Each structure stands twice: as C-alpha cells, then as structure tokens.
C-alpha cells in the first residue's frame, strides 16, 4: 500500500493506474468506514482512501482542533484490507491560497436546510473538498455512507449539476449492536451516554412504524422530539422529508427519509431512516 502525502505524489501514482475508486474520509476510521472500503474493493481493484480533516467544513466553535487523528492505526487497518493507496495531503496542499481565497462549490436548495441550517457553510466545505478530491484522484467510483444522508444527496446533486464523470455509491449505515450509528464522534461519549444515545435510532424506528398509519408529519416530528428530550437529548431537528430532494414530505411521496440531529451532552449525533410509502401510486 502506498502512502501519498502530496498532490504531486498522487498524480504520479494515478498516471500508472486505470480505474480507481475513492473513499473520502477524515480518518479515525471505524467499522463503518471499513465497510465503505470493502464495498469499493468489490467494485474496483485500485482503491484510494483519502484522510483529510477538512477545515472548511467546520464552524468557528466546532471540534476541528480536537477531532481525533489516528493516522498510523488507520493506515494499518487499510493495508490489511488491501487498499492500493492512502492520500494524506496537508492543508496547504489542498488550499494553497488559503481558505479565504479558495473557490467554493455551492449546491443551492439543499445545503441550507436541516444540518445546513444549524451549521452554516458546512455543506459548502463538504462540496468543495469532495469536488477537489474528485479532480485530484480522478476516480470512476466514489463510495459514501448513508448515515450522512444529506451530505450524500448534496454530493449527488453536485456531480449531476457539474457533469462530473464519477459514479456516487451510497452504502447502508453501519450500527453498533444497540442500534447507534457508527461515528467517529461516538468516541466523545461516556459509557452511559452511549447507552442513552441508542434511543435516537429507536425513535427513528418508532416513527417509521407510525408512518404506516399516520401521515400527520408535524405531529410525528413533535412526538419524536419530546421522546428524545425525555431520553436526555437536546434535539436539533427531527424531520420527515422526501427522500429524493429532502423537501418537506407529502403523503404522495414514494419514499421518505426521517432525519434527526440531537446533542447528547456536547456531542452532536445524526442519524436517518428511509421509509417506502406503500400507499403511493
């Protein structure tokens, strides 16, 4: 496995390859990330995993400085899976003119709702780094997790709007035995908080079951927020949306997605669950 620390190294390596799949990450890899890599390896012999904690997608009071960085352990895990290369650029290689002067990618209509409303500029940072990685690595395939469902849809729209020659593949959320979605930020939780945090997924499941008989979305959302509050969360949002474009749900939608973000202590957790509308024609 090659460890490519600069754009120049990456480009020299890339010239020697044919098809390549990319798995973009910020490191501190867990089993959810490794499942993305396994999915990519099923589709492509040459898999590149990028590890870059992207400062553009962090807000002023977020956890950029404290975000866990475990590069050595990450590389060992990726080498064991048979990854071809790991791309670990420095900030000045990715943003040579600095963040303030960097050209940015905006995906309108989807970037300023839900997580985008709570984290202004976040999805601009995500879209910009992913677009740059696509240009740097030039993959035919890129694999992302569905846990970050809004992020996945932002990237899909960006690829569509900019006519990028990349297939974007979403893979199912990997979960702990409790149902808690795997996340690097779970490491911030105490043992007790992890136990409490499992209520987030349980609330999503309960809401999914209720949707089969009740499409009063506002009522369901309010009940879910109350349940999360009683479980020790501070809810950010709990929203039922059209799964395709993340606009407000209607009873006629063929598929919904229930999205939630809530704080457990100081840790912000997100999760989602897709629901097929059996009544849709």
Curated annotation (Swiss-Prot):
Binding residues annotated for beta-alanine, in chain numbering: 57
Active site: 33 (proton donor)
Record's catalysed reaction(s): (R)-pantoate + beta-alanine + ATP = (R)-pantothenate + AMP + diphosphate + H(+)
GO biological process assignments: pantothenate biosynthetic process
InterPro entries listed in its UniProt record: Cyt_trans-like, Pantoate_ligase, Pantoate_ligase_C, Rossmann-like_a/b/a_fold
MF annotations from Gene Ontology: ATP binding; pantoate-beta-alanine ligase activity
EC numbers on record: 6.3.2.1
Keywords per UniProt: ATP-binding, Cytoplasm, Ligase, Nucleotide-binding, Pantothenate biosynthesis
CDD domains, alphabetized: PanC
Similarity section: Belongs to the pantothenate synthetase family.
Protein name per its UniProtKB record: Pantothenate synthetase
Organism encoding this protein: Idiomarina loihiensis (strain ATCC BAA-735 / DSM 15497 / L2-TR)
């Amino acid at each position: 496995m090659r460890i490519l620390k600069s754009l120049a190294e990456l480009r020299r390596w890339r010239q020697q390859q044919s098809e390549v799949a990319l798995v973009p990450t910020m490191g501190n890899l867990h089993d959810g990330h490794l499942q993305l890599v396994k999915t990519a390896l099923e589709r492509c012999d040459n898999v590149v995993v990028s590890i870059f904690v992207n400062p553009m997608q962090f807000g002023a009071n977020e956890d950029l400085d404290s975000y866990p960085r475990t590069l050595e352990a990450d590389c060992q895990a990726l080498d064991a899976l048979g990854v071809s290369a790991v791309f670990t650029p420095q900030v000045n290689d990715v943003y040579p003119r600095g963040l303030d002067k960097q050209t940015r990618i905006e995906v309108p209509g989807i970037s300023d709702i839900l997580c985008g409303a709570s984290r202004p500029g976040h999805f601009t940072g995500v879209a910009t780094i992913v677009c740059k990685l696509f240009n740097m690595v030039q993959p035919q395939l890129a694999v992302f997790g569905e846990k970050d469902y809004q992020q996945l849809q932002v990237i899909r729209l960006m690829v569509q709007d900019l006519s990028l020659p990349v297939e974007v593949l979403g893979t199912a959320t990997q979960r702990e035995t409790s149902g808690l979605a795997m996340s690097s930020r779970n490491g911030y939780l105490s043992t007790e908080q992890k136990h409490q945090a499992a209520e987030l997924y349980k609330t999503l499941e309960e809401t999914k079951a209720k949707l089969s008989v009740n499409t009063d979305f506002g009522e369901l959302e309010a009940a879910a927020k109350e349940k999360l509050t009683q479980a020790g969360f501070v809810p950010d949002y709990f929203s039922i949306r059209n799964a395709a474009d993340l606009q407000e749900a209607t009873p006629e939608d063929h598929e919904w997605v229930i999205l939630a973000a809530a704080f457990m202590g100081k840790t912000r957790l997100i999760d989602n669950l897709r629901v097929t509308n059996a009544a849709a024609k």
